[in-house]
Amino acid sequence: MPEGPEIRRAADSLEAAIKGKPLTNAWFAFPQLKSFESSLIGQKVTQIETRGKALLTHFSHNLTLYSHNQLYGVWRVVDAGEHPQTSRILRVRLQTADKAILLYSASDIEMLTPEQLLTHPFLQRVGPDVLDMRLTAEEVKARLLSPKFRNRQFSGLLLDQAFLAGLGNYLRVEILWEVGLAAQRKASQLSEEQLDALSHALLEIPRLSYNTRGVVDDNKHHGALFRFKVFHREGKACERCGGVIERSTLSSRPFYGCPVCQK
């Protein structure tokens, strides 16, 4: 399943294709969205925002297209007028003079006014996105210590989009290894030093993954690039202490960690 960094990179590719360009065509599969097609002609996409696995496509006339990929939804960028051969069902097409972005297979799609955006049920439930560069470690620390989250085990908390949007299983695993914490620990049990380390890692590791995952550094400065330290590395030596990385199941998802140095 894609996590926040992958979803943000997908949004970047959509923005690169059509942001700031007048729309020449808009098409929606769902009848309740048909009335918006003509009003979008000539409008521009001003921003594509991510909130966890939801995308918010903001238009210049202040409406916002909300879409959630759920399990099967996928966006694609094509040349204007191109209609790819695929078994997927087209839901949305937004086209400019040279490019188009297509949404396939998703079913959770709405057009929202600014007022509706503030009261949308999913957007009200979901926490701040870890790839929102305005979010600070101090704000994350405050969320960790809030009554709602302070006594939750990290195994479940770091998968809960109400805590922080954009985290998923590989990020959960890598963040907890980076700060040397066991999945059963809770924020209420941590020292100030541990809380500070975790608060920073909850932002730094997703952002490092977003910026560098899959990037090859010719100078071999691997410490500056994201790579898996424990995810899918069961049976191998822990890079920090030499212990053997183990795989288990926590919150119904595979978990990887070092039983020696994660306490």
From Swiss-Prot:
An annotated Gene Ontology molecular function: damaged DNA binding
PROSITE patterns: FPG_CAT (PS51068), ZF_FPG_2 (PS51066)
Catalytic activity: 2'-deoxyribonucleotide-(2'-deoxyribose 5'-phosphate)-2'-deoxyribonucleotide-DNA = a 3'-end 2'-deoxyribonucleotide-(2,3-dehydro-2,3-deoxyribose 5'-phosphate)-DNA + a 5'-end 5'-phospho-2'-deoxyribonucleoside-DNA + H(+)
Pfam family name, one: Fapy_DNA_glyco
Active site: 2 (schiff-base intermediate with dna), 3 (proton donor), 53 (proton donor), 253 (proton donor)
Zinc finger (FPG-type): 229-263
InterPro entries per UniProt: DNA_glyclase/AP_lyase_DNA-bd (IPR015886), EcNei-like_N (IPR044091), Endonuclease-VIII (IPR023713), FPG_cat (IPR012319), MutM-like_N-ter (IPR035937), Ribosomal_uS13-like_H2TH (IPR010979), Znf_DNA_glyclase/AP_lyase (IPR000214)
Cofactor stoichiometry and binding remark: Binds 1 zinc ion per subunit.
Residues noted as binding DNA in the record, renumbered to the chain: 70, 125, 169
Keywords tagged on the record: DNA damage, DNA repair, DNA-binding, Glycosidase, Hydrolase, Lyase, Metal-binding, Multifunctional enzyme, Zinc, Zinc-finger
Similarity field: Belongs to the FPG family.
Protein name: Endonuclease 8
Source organism per UniProt: Enterobacter sp. (strain 638)
